[in-house]
């Protein structure tokens, strides 16, 4: 590794790599390890502009005997995973997140002082943080490539590194940790990297709960303690006891859009799992508290509650523990399909758990035992405030067309015609009238289709569940007010009094452009306002809009839609919460959370925000307590700053510039992706898209429909496929033409540089584009093409795309006024450079295996098929993202 990288990171990569080498030698012999070293050496020299070494590498890989292909791919895949462990460990130990620009790493203490310096009163700080509502929504897609079995081993390896570093003067402890490390690496090597079956939605939900148990359960009280201390120092006050600036929700088990595996029964099971896991975790907390709170001094209120018991805290906690254990047993019985009988009442609400703990806390403070009150008891109070009785709030997501189908069948059954044939005004009139009507609409014995029955059953599950366990009902592919009214009516018909927030999801370019008009019309309906109250949630889709229109056009449409929504909700005196459906990659709205939030339009955050955390990003951001703590700090910093120190409104000339850039980029993108007849055949030929369906990433199918072109693909495999070949096309196509056009005009360069310097939205976009181009590699993309594409027309298209990428890099460097990419972030550049010699062989092997697979018409041996899947996992690990 480069000598500039931190010594401890270098040492840990070397320790893990050496141990992996010994493990492989024990399994396959020293001769095989020599092959790995030969491949690595050729790849390393090939990265030093040695074209002969690059040629030798390809020849060497193509000449490997079939029996070596799988273990070679596994060796490089595991090394990249171990590099990720070392990097993750480094970040946790030094509490540093490598941002895009030096000096932009958010610091909560510094931010509080900056806010005070801007003239905000100390009380304003406390009130803003206490009222802050940031929900991080854990989702299962683009899913985690690495098996959870291996994740547990990797976490244990990280613990060994921690032990070894902390035992420099205790050789026997360090030696035991080294021995355990060798064992774990051997376990990982002898474990299949690829799942044999796709995880079920319940499996995904269990993984989400495991992240809470293993990481967030500790990180949440740690975060509140830090926030408490900083507020006390800066504002002279502590955070209110029941404040929960950051909470967690989930789509795992609730997101049924395009996933037939998420049924009403699955949703009910996941809700019960959340109740069971929460009760189990609280029971552990209460056992500890019952052991520790042996004091006899108590205030009158607690004495009145427990009587003359000599250990009043234990007496109260004993009762509470019995209820929590009964809740755990009840949930388990429901999951097992068994009856449950107990004379102890179960815990139904957050307050039933919180109130007894608060009584203990107040009593301890009243009798002068504040130090004890602010220990483990306060941690549990904070957990209850954040996690409630279900750990996460479960969102429900369904596509608008499924609700329309319900009313189409229903209107036909009632002799009213076909709902699908009605125009928007007719639909609204019907839905609003039924929302006001006291009589039921759905017949008791209605013989509807299985699809409609499933939708209704889902609403019945929602109706049976306590409101605290549920989050938002998200409507994907929403385009009209009737899409929201339909869900409201289904809640009324099936759910009675239960009303969840309903969030239309605007995810195509046209939908984003119409979002303001839809919400304006919706909020102007008196019947809807009476039902919705003074709040409205709207979800902004990043993945599909970028696939639909190109990244630059989508980013600008998202920005403008948010501006319009802020203005409309302000006019209607409605509190707007924006829900950002971001992924891990640039093409799906990914990037550093702090920069992304601060690049939103002024007024769009205002203390309230929801954002998805997806797949492998959950592990990178929240998989370990220290890193989870840092991630929560970043979100708190960004939302607090965006609320109290919002960015300035963009200047009118900047808007005009973005309108023009967006239009040029959109036309260039559509001209290739939608209008070039060679594009889809090229995409299918040059990427591993067709093989992705066999990679058991998650419970969701890779395609919305089995036939069709790019439009039938979900955004996740669309981006995954291009990432594998290093062309990274979805995140940049069209941008180069837009920027080049402007640079060729008088004053264009100065205007773009000014926008970059003074407009966070534009600056953040360019920063993410720079990172993306640093990971792209046209030479690797060209090799895939040489190996997999025969038709001259397709080869010509590929050459054109690579030339566009090269021109974009030149144009971007001009705007940035730099000689090289990532010139000002050398750590990130070095991290990419260090990984390349381990990723390059996987690209070479993947192209070879794809060609063999096609030659065999998909009938390659199971070993080669597995090797192909391992190359995909390894490249994703090396680039630190999937889709």
UniProtKB/Swiss-Prot annotation:
Report the enzyme's class at the first EC level: lyase
Q: In the Enzyme Commission scheme, what number(s) does this protein have?
A: 4.1.1.31
- GO BP field: carbon fixation; oxaloacetate metabolic process; tricarboxylic acid cycle
The protein's role, per its UniProt record: Forms oxaloacetate, a four-carbon dicarboxylic acid source for the tricarboxylic acid cycle.
Q: Which residues form a coiled coil?
A: none
GO cellular component terms, semicolon-separated: cytosol
- Which PANTHER family has this protein been placed in? PHOSPHOENOLPYRUVATE CARBOXYLASE (PTHR30523:SF6)
- Cofactor(s) required for function per UniProt: Mg(2+)
Identify the keywords attached in UniProt to this record, alphabetized.
Carbon dioxide fixation, Lyase, Magnesium
Q: Does the keyword Magnesium apply?
A: yes
Q: In which family does this protein belong, per the annotation?
A: Belongs to the PEPCase type 1 family.
Name the UniProt record assigns to this protein = Phosphoenolpyruvate carboxylase
